[in-house]
């Protein structure tokens, strides 16, 4: 399997050095919201490699470690002497202080949650135009009691004497708190002050830039050869296909594989909506029996993902041969809608542990015969939607709630069978109908409906005892799928969904609500 689409070089890139922070991806998103491009690199990356990427600025994230712990992440002092503007947050702030000769105390001066910050120099680079007293979000045990030489202390709390410092001459800045979270009321403003004033960057990274850069990168990669793109019915594959079509036009053929794992009515919707919006050449392959046969007897979620990924590629290879027989030239490239969170969750890009194999990243066989084109690989979901709108795709496609490539296959906890798929389709359709009727489509990120196929519970319907399956509702709110909270849906909507499912769907006698945030749980059950 060949490498993905080469990322076009951004003129100004902010590198977020990840020290194991819960919010590292959120920091990268906040930088992009300020219209400056950002990427994440692991703290294990040597300083010379970080600097070799020619960053316009560097942000040091928070992290769970103490600077005093044996084996805690460190940074070579040369990073701070390279002339690149650096902004330390939480652990990154403490690491900067300690490395440059300041004092960090392991004194038990803990602050967790909302804290009042007193700004001691309102005209400073970071805090100009913000209130002298402001709420910030803290999460630390150690505390900085003395700033390094040459730094000006610009903020403190009742517990921490040095909660922010700045060195304009060396362009080094730091805060003890988390400006990236919404609980820090002026956090985005402080971050933008670092980017625009401290680092001298301009807010010129836009969806138009993304389209222009990716179109050029795709043309350079594909040349005059041909590509196919698998349409799943989702936002990601649709936007990826639209981008590639803009780049290479009729050299692209889209293939929709009906693997039998889609929700009710979705196959017809894909054929109608996407073709109408783009005019792209679309080939539909009915492979439902093949997928069900391959999944027979399989309950392990990782194995299911691998099988679905493998069969998907095999179907694509067959489609390639058919397209070649019909149109001639060889198809050399496969377009995928891989996003940045997919890469991160699969352990790529940040040195993190593999949470689960993503169907767009780790679920592909090693002997794949295509070279991958992944034009969305560095984007978050909200950015993908903006690119889709810029490309002129309709809201029916761009605003569609996320749905995994493996489809209902990973929303059945247990073996996947036709009967179980039919049952889950009906339950899912009811939930979607009621959420739409209540006007909640845009208020939630997505609402997976899950069948616990290997679980049964006792119930009573009419005068008889039942022994049916439970259905799980998993409504979540999120900005980018990296973190999520369960959505507080109105009780009357939940009641209507539950009543309809238990009355209208055979062999289901219980509906339960998943109230787990991410972390610790992932959005999908499998």
Swiss-Prot record:
Q: Which residues bind ATP?
A: 232-238
GO MF entry, a single one? ATP binding
The record's catalysed reaction(s) read:
XMP + L-glutamine + ATP + H2O = GMP + L-glutamate + AMP + diphosphate + 2 H(+)
Stored SUPFAM superfamilies: Adenine nucleotide alpha hydrolases-like, Class I glutamine amidotransferase-like, GMP synthetase C-terminal dimerisation domain
Recorded hits in InterPro entries, A to Z, give:
Class_I_gatase-like, GATASE, GMP_synth_C, GMP_synth_GATase, GMP_synthase, GMPS_ATP_PPase_dom, NAD/GMP_synthase, Rossmann-like_a/b/a_fold
| CDD domains named among the record's database cross-references | GATase1_GMP_Synthase, GMP_synthase_C
**Catalytic residue positions:** 90 (nucleophile), 178, 180
GO cellular component entries: cytosol
Pfam families xref list = GATase (PF00117), GMP_synt_C (PF00958), NAD_synthase (PF02540)
Q: One GO BP annotation here?
A: GMP biosynthetic process
- Keywords from the UniProt entry: ATP-binding, Glutamine amidotransferase, GMP biosynthesis, Ligase, Nucleotide-binding, Purine biosynthesis
**EC number(s) for this protein?**
6.3.5.2
Q: Which residues form the GMPS ATP-PPase domain?
A: 205-400
Domain Glutamine amidotransferase type-1, which positions? Answer: 13-204
Which pathway is this protein engaged in? Purine metabolism; GMP biosynthesis; GMP from XMP (L-Gln route): step 1/1
Which NCBIfam families does UniProt cross-reference here? guaA_Cterm, guaA_Nterm, PRK00074.1
Please explain the role this protein plays, according to its UniProt record. Answer: Catalyzes the synthesis of GMP from XMP.
HAMAP family recorded for this chain? GMP_synthase
Assembly with partners or alone: Homodimer.
Q: State the protein's name.
A: GMP synthase [glutamine-hydrolyzing]
Highest lineage ranks of the organism? Bacteria, Bacillati, Actinomycetota, Actinomycetes, Kitasatosporales
């Amino acid at each position: 399997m060949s490498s993905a689409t080469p990322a076009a070089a951004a003129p100004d890139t902010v590198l977020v050095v990840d020290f194991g922070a819960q919010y590292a991806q959120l920091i990268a998103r906040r930088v992009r919201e300020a219209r400056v491009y950002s990427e994440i690199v692991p703290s294990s990356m040597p300083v010379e490699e970080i600097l070799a990427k020619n960053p316009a600025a560097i942000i040091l994230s928070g992290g769970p470690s103490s600077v005093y712990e044996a084996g805690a992440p460190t940074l070579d002092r040369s990073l701070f002497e390279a002339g690149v503007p650096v902004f330390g947050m939480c652990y990154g702030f403490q690491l900067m202080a300690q490395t440059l000769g300041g004092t960090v105390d392991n004194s038990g001066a803990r602050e967790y949650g909302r804290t009042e910050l007193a700004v001691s120099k309102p005209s400073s680079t970071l805090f100009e135009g913000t209130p002298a007293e402001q709420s910030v979000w803290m999460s630390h045990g150690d505390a900085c009691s003395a700033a390094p030489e040459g730094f000006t202390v610009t903020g403190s709390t009742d517990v921490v004497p040095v909660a922010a410092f700045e060195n304009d001459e060396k362009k080094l800045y730091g805060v003890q708190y988390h400006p990236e979270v919404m609980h820090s009321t002026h956090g985005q403003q402080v971050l933008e002050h670092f980017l625009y004033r401290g680092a001298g960057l301009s807010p010129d990274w836009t969806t138009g830039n993304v389209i222009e850069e990716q179109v050029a990168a795709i043309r350079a990669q594909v040349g005059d050869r041909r590509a196919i793109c698998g349409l799943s019915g989702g936002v990601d594959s649709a936007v990826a296909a639209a981008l590639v079509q803009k780049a290479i036009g009729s050299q692209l053929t889209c293939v929709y594989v009906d693997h039998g794992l889609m929700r009710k009515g979705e196959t017809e919707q894909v054929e109608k909506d996407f073709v109408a919006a783009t005019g792209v050449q679309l080939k539909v392959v009915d492979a439902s029996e093949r997928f069900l046969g391959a999944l027979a007897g399989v309950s392990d979620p990782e194995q299911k993902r691998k099988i679905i990924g493998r069969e998907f590629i095999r179907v694509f290879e067959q489609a390639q041969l058919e397209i070649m027989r019909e149109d001639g030239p060889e198809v050399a490239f496969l377009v995928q809608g891989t996003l940045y969170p997919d890469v991160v969750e699969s352990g790529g890009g940040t040195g993190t542990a593999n949470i689960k194999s993503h169907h767009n990243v780790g679920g592909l066989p090693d002997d794949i015969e295509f070279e991958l084109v992944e034009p969305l690989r560095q984007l978050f979901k909200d950015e993908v939607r903006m690119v889709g709108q810029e490309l002129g795709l309709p809201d029916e496609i761009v605003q569609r709630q996320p749905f995994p490539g493996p489809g209902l296959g990973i929303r059945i906890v247990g073996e996947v069978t036709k009967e179980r798929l039919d049952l889950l389709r009906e339950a899912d359709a009811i939930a979607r109908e009621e959420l739409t009727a209540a006007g909640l489509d845009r208020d939630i990120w997505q609402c997976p409906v899950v069948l616990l196929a290997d679980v049964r519970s006792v119930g009573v319907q009419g005068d008889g005892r039942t022994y049916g399956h439970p259905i799980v509702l998993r409504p979540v709110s999120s900005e980018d799928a990296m973190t999520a909270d369960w959505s507080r849906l109105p009780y009357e909507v939940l009641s209507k969904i539950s009543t309809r499912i238990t009355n209208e769907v055979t062999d289901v006698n219980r509906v339960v609500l998943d109230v787990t945030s991410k972390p610790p749980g992932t959005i999908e059950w499998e």
